[in-house]
């Protein structure tokens, strides 16, 4: 069918090329001329500045009073150790801040795997090197890991109370974003006789705590929510008060079918009226194991799939289900 030159095109072809577990290339076409850069730049800025993540924000090392110190028997100085701590890829399931400990002595390499973890903390890059010890070396430290968004300088977190007890507690500039690299190119596209169209190719790499495809979805959702205010824009002279629900992660509103579980696991969940991911994460392991025909193998599968999306069982949602999620929707989920 001939497409009119006056018809405003919307993208009809989306291709996701998985380069590695942490990198993907997403192609979107066709786009009207100029929209490749418009959308590419907007998504790039959101991905770099607005993706939530976790990072080490404070370190307390035995025998160290300030970052310009050196530790006997440790090859790296304190500044190098702090820089290495910034490279940790950490996921917190259900908490906004935790304190972790690391203790090692004797000759060898200190890696992220040497950090003692709580049950709801995961380090995606356990082979990441933190320091190298000589035979007489020892490294003992406490690490504070927090959840945040974007980039946060250390001095922005300090209060008057912190100033009085900051000796030995080393503050780190924190880059919370799970996005390591984002680039986009705009190529030519063609639809029938129209040759002046755009094709947007996004090359995205994360630190492994967030799937690249999910990062794109979240960035697009943020952009959509911000632009929604302009859709119903009116020239009212009086300010309009908009009642807004507490923000809920869009992934929680998606059906459990999107998790691509085995048929057995999916059917067991639906038999328990678990239709949405938000329903699922509020269940505990004990509750799920009471589900008929759902055994430990299915439970492990569910936990692994949730963990790959930064979620876990036993999480608490204060405003679930949201008003926008109607009960009769579940009948068709």
UniProtKB/Swiss-Prot annotation:
Gene3D superfamilies: 5' to 3' exonuclease, C-terminal subdomain (1.10.150.20), DNA-directed RNA polymerase, insert domain (2.170.120.12), RNA polymerase, RBP11-like subunit (3.30.1360.10). Disulfide bonds: none annotated. GO terms for biological process: DNA-templated transcription. The N-terminal domain is essential for RNAP assembly and basal transcription, whereas the C-terminal domain is involved in interaction with transcriptional regulators and with upstream promoter elements. DNA-dependent RNA polymerase catalyzes the transcription of DNA into RNA using the four ribonucleoside triphosphates as substrates. Pfam families: RNA_pol_A_bac (PF01000), RNA_pol_A_CTD (PF03118), RNA_pol_L (PF01193). Residues 1-234 are annotated as: Alpha N-terminal domain (alpha-NTD). GO terms for molecular function: DNA binding; DNA-directed RNA polymerase activity; protein dimerization activity. Homodimer. The RNAP catalytic core consists of 2 alpha, 1 beta, 1 beta' and 1 omega subunit. When a sigma factor is associated with the core the holoenzyme is formed, which can initiate transcription. This is DNA-directed RNA polymerase subunit alpha. The gene is rpoA. Belongs to the RNA polymerase alpha chain family. GO terms for cellular component: cytoplasm; DNA-directed RNA polymerase complex. CDD domains: RNAP_alpha_NTD. It catalyses: RNA(n) + a ribonucleoside 5'-triphosphate = RNA(n+1) + diphosphate. It is an enzyme of class 2 (transferase). Keywords: DNA-directed RNA polymerase, Nucleotidyltransferase, Transcription, Transferase. The lineage of its organism: Bacteria, Pseudomonadati, Pseudomonadota, Gammaproteobacteria, Pseudomonadales. NCBIfam families: PRK05182.1-2 (NF003513), PRK05182.2-5 (NF003519), rpoA (TIGR02027). Residues 248-333 are annotated as: Alpha C-terminal domain (alpha-CTD). Its EC number is 2.7.7.6.
């Amino acid at each position: 069918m001939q497409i009119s030159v006056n018809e405003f095109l919307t993208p009809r072809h989306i291709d996701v090329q998985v380069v590695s577990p942490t990198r993907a290339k997403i192609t979107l076409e066709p786009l009207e001329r100029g929209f490749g850069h418009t959308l590419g730049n907007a998504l790039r800025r959101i991905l770099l500045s607005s993706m939530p993540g976790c990072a080490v924000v404070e370190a307390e090392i035995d025998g160290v009073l300030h970052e310009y110190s050196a530790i006997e028997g440790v090859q790296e100085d304190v500044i190098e150790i702090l820089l290495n701590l910034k490279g940790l890829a950490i996921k917190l399931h259900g908490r906004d801040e935790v304190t972790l400990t690391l203790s090692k002595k004797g000759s060898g390499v200190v890696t992220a795997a040497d950090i003692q973890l709580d049950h709801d903390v995961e380090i995606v890059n356990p082979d990441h090197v933190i320091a190298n010890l000589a035979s007489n070396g020892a490294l003992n430290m406490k690490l504070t890991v927090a959840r945040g968004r974007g980039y946060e300088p250390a001095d922005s977190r300090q209060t008057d109370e912190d100033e009085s007890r900051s000796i030995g507690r080393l503050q780190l500039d924190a880059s919370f974003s799970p996005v390591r690299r984002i680039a986009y190119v705009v190529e030519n596209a063609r639809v029938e006789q129209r040759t002046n169209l755009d094709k947007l190719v996004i090359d995205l790499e994360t630190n492994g705590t967030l799937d690249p495809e999910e990062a794109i979805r979240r960035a697009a959702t943020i952009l959509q929510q911000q632009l929604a205010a302009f859709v119903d824009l009116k020239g009212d002279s009086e300010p309009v008060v908009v009642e807004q629900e507490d923000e809920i992660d869009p992934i929680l509103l998606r059906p459990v079918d999107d998790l691509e579980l085995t048929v057995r696991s999916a059917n067991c969940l639906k038999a328990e009226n678990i239709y949405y991911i938000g329903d699922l994460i509020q269940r505990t392991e004990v509750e799920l194991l009471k589900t008929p025909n759902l055994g430990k193998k299915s439970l492990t599968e569910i936990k692994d799939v949730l963990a790959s999306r930064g979620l876990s069982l036993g999480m608490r949602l204060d405003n679930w289900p949201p008003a926008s999620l109607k009960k009769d929707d579940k009948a068709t989920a």
